[in-house]
Amino acid sequence: GFAHKAKCLHNAALFRVRNAFTAHNKTALTANEKEVQGELALLKGQKSYYVPGYGILQRLMRITNNPDFFSGLPMQTAQHVIRQVCTDFKGWLASLKKYRKDPSGYTGKPKMPGYCRNDTASYLFTNQDAVIYDGKLKLPRIKIRIPVRRRHGRLMEVKVKPVSGGYELLLVYQVKDASVQSGKHAAAVDFGVDNTMAVVSDTGKSILFKGRFIKSVNQYFMKKKAERISLMSKGKETTERVWSKYLDRLSAYRTSYIRDCFHKMSRKL
């Protein structure tokens, strides 16, 4: 699927950025560095690139007819994957520069961005590939239409994140700047466990959000997690971490449930 293709393209782009960076000012190059330098030599103009930017990297993918770049991802999706790789690498270089000036602000030396070891990676669709029609989201090459709530704004992009055997969609809209009006009244919010939120205001109105639903799902999660880990840990070293797809799904359920509760509470508030 797209998530696997995005992962392959991410690693292919990062491979070229990393090896171009490590080959800089070196005489004895590794086989990987020689391969990347050979590809860069195909580009007319400057022969050496310290850190290939988005424009250089995209040209490199096209001129070499890179199979991961032309694997079937929508073109703007593939371009975003490459752009994100360049952004992450430049962010690492900026952090490294700050670390060398003042290491006290870091717990350790920033590590170079690593390859994606999972079988899938996050990606996005722009509004040229993802559209909302008749209250349903249409994504490329997917027959299922996903119902979405109508928003007052223009859909800009859809971010797709693989989560526990499924996918989490984040829809980004462009809306007009809302004017914030400062009112004459005030309210206070107190967060707790038994009562998730207690809200009072100077208008005399108050609202109380019970926390038993969140406590209940959290207790259920901890109970099932302990049972499964105990079962999986039999005959193994106690220091060895055990995990499974079932625990992934269980964790995702707990997270989604609690997130949904807070969204509903904030909406009512």
Name what the model sees in each region.
Residues 1-269:
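Nucleic-acid substrate recognition interfaces
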